[in-house]
Amino acid sequence: MNKPITASTYVRCLSLGLIRKLSDFIDPQEGWKKLAVAIKKPSGDDRYNQFHIRRFEALLQIGKSPTCELLFDWGTTNCTVGDLVDILVQNEFFAPASLLLPDAVPKNVNTLPSKVTVVAVQQKPKPLCGKDRTSVISDENPEQNYVLPDSSSPENTSLEFSDTRFHSFSFFELKDVTNNFDERPISVGGNKMGEGGFGVVYKGYVNNRTVAVKKLAAMVDISTEELKQQFDQEIKVMAKCQHENLVELLGFSSDGDDLCLVYVYMPNGSLLDRLSCLDGTPPLSWNMRCKIAQGAANGLSYLHENHHIHRDIKSANILLDEDFTAKISDFGLARASEKFAQTVMTSRIVGTTAYMAPEALRGEITPKSDIYSFGVVLLEIITGLPAVDEHREPQLLLDIKEEIEDEEKTIEDYVDRKMNDIDSTSIETMYSVASQCLHEKKNKRPDIKKVQQLLEEMTGS
């Protein structure tokens, strides 16, 4: 017979079946991230940093459960069921906590998930440690929520955006202008430009104008309901925010098999691609990099002035037009906040882990998290290195800050040598700005206006 589970039972001694049951509760809506950031070392420091969380996240791509792998890993430290239940209760995971120690759950709470919306998902892999999962759409800050209309009813096919300046395309039109969403890369004569967590981008031609068509598609662990929310949010933000340094949305389609967004085409791709010299493009000069940094800061400043937090600032989301003018893109995760100076909490942790501020990993939504992410982008601009590389030491680019502060290296050791117009003084200045943006404590980071000022002083513009 199996021994009864007590608070002193080691997590590593739990049966695989029980761990699978726990993962069924914790995997949806990335609850495992909340669990991971709550786990501490005996010293009180975080056990898991951004890189660890990114690795757990990557397990979804091969059909594994992050919760299972997290518990397997943490279990090697001789943590107990009592330790686990404490964290579960603190984060209001009452149902899985009651599976382990029913008496540890407060008597006045319901251990069944409340306000659950079960939604269909497309192409969702089956986790190797758990059953097929449904997404739980949680009731976040009610002032922040925007209720989507029922897109299945004919009168709501425009998703209530008929009063915006955007053109409503038919799905058939977009299929036609993208050669039936030709999946072949542009380099071999197809239309596919790239893909991300929320869809695939295709090159198309509308009235002799080149456009970029993003067809939203449920990737790993993203439900169709979340996809609709991304679509809705992107249009809402774009309707309110127009600026030289924000990408321009031309229209959308919501009448077909997939939701689509149509943008002005950016011929020079993303900052990420140009820094890596993708497809043999020449390296960006230092002067050009400074211009791009200032443009991106201007775009972010406009968003913050208009009470929007982007939540996914990264080099892949900074696009470049024919003049290499920076255009911030991808507003599907953006949040509007009337109480902009205050921190808002969310049960849904989103963003790209290698760029995420410590508080963002805890579910806080604050403009200072955008500042932190922008600090990582500035390091990419200086070094030409990607934000994360598992074959590099340090693997996370933001960790070079520690090496420089410990005087093991200087920023000169990391400067991208592909540039032929290196200016040591302005590089030091940009690194100083990046370092301030990357302060662990959000209140110690500069606001975007200060960042703008420092970058302008750097170039004398």
Swiss-Prot record:
- Keywords from the UniProt entry: Acetylation, ATP-binding, Cytoplasm, Immunity, Innate immunity, Kinase, Magnesium, Nucleotide-binding, Phosphoprotein, Serine/threonine-protein kinase, Transferase
What the protein does?
Serine/threonine-protein kinase that plays a critical role in initiating innate immune response against foreign pathogens. Involved in Toll-like receptor (TLR) and IL-1R signaling pathways. Is rapidly recruited by MYD88 to the receptor-signaling complex upon TLR activation to form the Myddosome together with IRAK2. Phosphorylates initially IRAK1, thus stimulating the kinase activity and intensive autophosphorylation of IRAK1. Phosphorylates E3 ubiquitin ligases Pellino proteins (PELI1, PELI2 and PELI3) to promote pellino-mediated polyubiquitination of IRAK1.
Q: State if Acetylation is listed as a keyword.
A: yes
Query: What are its cofactors?
Result: Mg(2+)
Question: Active site: which residues?
Answer: 312 (proton acceptor)
Which terms in the Gene Ontology molecular function aspect does this entry carry?
ATP binding; interleukin-1 receptor binding; magnesium ion binding; protein kinase binding; protein serine kinase activity; protein serine/threonine kinase activity
Chief location of this protein? cytoplasm
Lineage, uppermost ranks: Eukaryota, Metazoa, Chordata, Craniata, Vertebrata
GO annotations of cellular component type: cell surface; cytoplasm; nucleus; plasma membrane
Q: Which organism is it from?
A: Bos taurus
This protein's source sits in the domain of life called Eukaryota
Entries under InterPro entries matching the protein? DEATH-like_dom_sf (IPR011029), IRAK4 (IPR017428), IRAK4_Death (IPR037970), Kinase-like_dom_sf (IPR011009), Prot_kinase_dom (IPR000719)
What post-translational changes are documented for it? Phosphorylated.
According to UniProt, the name of this protein is Interleukin-1 receptor-associated kinase 4
Modified residues annotated as Phosphoserine in this record: 347
UniProt lists the family membership as follows: Belongs to the protein kinase superfamily. TKL Ser/Thr protein kinase family. Pelle subfamily.
Per the record, residues carrying N6-acetyllysine are 34
* EC numbers: 2.7.11.1
